[in-house]
Amino acid sequence: MAKPETLKRVLKEQHIDKNVVEKINDGYENVNNKSPKKKKAEYLFHAVDEMDSSLDKESCRQIMELCACTIDSSGLNKIVAQFAEKTNGLSLKEKIEKLANINHLGNPALREDGTMLVDLGSGSTCPCPQISGIEINNPISFTYCMCCGGHLKYQYENALGIRLEVEIKSSILQSMGKKPCVFILVKRDA
């Protein structure tokens, strides 16, 4: 999930209505990336609830995808760039099999229909570093998880050299730990 400062920046960059942004940040104006984890989680869950009630689904998706924490991760970006260079010329299936060896990219599988299924988090603990260890008492909207979706989309596009769309199949947060975090990546036309 987004860091609080990233979400606040993306809301501005996407020209979200000032009144909506005020509702999202109301009471959380001073929450930043250095705030205690519990306070950050409280703000982020509140922000997602406000976004879901004030914005259309596609706007929520775009905002959260742009908040992906690894977009600015020079370490992972370098590893993915090296992977893309080393696997140039391999089939999509071969590349996907090798992607499973890179930390933080989940367990990918190429399906017969050409889509990719990526298991990002199994068990009952959300893989999101912004909320790990925080007790979750209610189901959390898929909107929250689109940040991880954006992470996968960004890294897989760079690793595979193709344009992708991402969908959420299931989420630990939304299912209260009953289902894993699974995403579907679909190749899209350029």
Regions found by a protein language model. Give the residues of each.
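Secondary-structure-rich domain cores
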Residues: 158-165, 180-183
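N-terminal accessory segment detector
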Residues: 1-140, 165, 178, 188-190
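Short, solvent-exposed loop/turn elements at beta->coil junctions and helix N-caps
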Residues: 168-174
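Active-site helix/loop of acyl-thioester processing domains in fatty-acid/polyketide metabolism
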Residues: 142-161
